[in-house]
Amino acid sequence: MENWQAWRKQQRERLIADRMAVSALQHQHWSNTISDFLQREFLVLQTMKIGLYWPFRGEYDPRSASLYFWESGATLALPEVVDRHKPLVFREWWPDVPMKTGAYNIPVPQGTHRIEPDVLIIPVVGFDQKGYRLGYGSGYYDRTLAAYPVPPLTIGVAFEMQRLENVHPQQHDIAMQYVVTEAGMFKGCF
C-alpha cells in the first residue's frame, strides 16, 4: 500500500469501533483478566512510580489494577495534555483525588504534583508483533517517551482483537517493551 497514513487512519477507526462494540460484560471480563496479569507478572510495580491513564473510548480499564498497586505502595499518576505539540505531563493520582476535565474530556488530577514515572502503562488502539502501537494519531506517547533521558518501562495494554500483523511504524514510533492482553503477557518482539 502506498499511503500508510491513510491505512493507519482506517485501521484506527475500525479498531476503535470494534472495541466500543464489545459488550459491557465482555469488556469487564477482559479488563479483569488483564489486571490480573499485571498484578501477577509485574510485582515490581508495587514500589514504583506508575503512569497510567483514565479509560477512554472502550480502552482496557486500569482502575482496579491502579487501586491494587496504590494499596501496595506504588505512586500513581495520570497524563495531562498541556500542549498539543509537547510531551504529556503526569500528575499524581490516588482514589478520591479532586479531578478536572482535561483535553478530550478525559479527567485529570487537579492541583497534584508532577511525577516522572518509572513505568508507563499505555493504552493501545492497535499493536503488532514487534511491540509497536497504533495510537490515536497525535503522537503524545511517542513524544513523551522520546523526552525522557532514561526511558521508563513501557507496558502496552490492549484486547487481542486489537492485534495487527504490522502497524507500519513511522520513524518516530517507539516500540513497547511489553504488551498485556487478556491472552497473556508478551515481551519485546513477539
Describe each PLM feature range.
Residues 84-190:
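Conserved phosphate- and dinucleotide-binding cores of soluble alpha/beta proteins
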Residues 1-116:
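N-terminal active-site beta-alpha-beta segment that forms phosphate/nucleotide-binding
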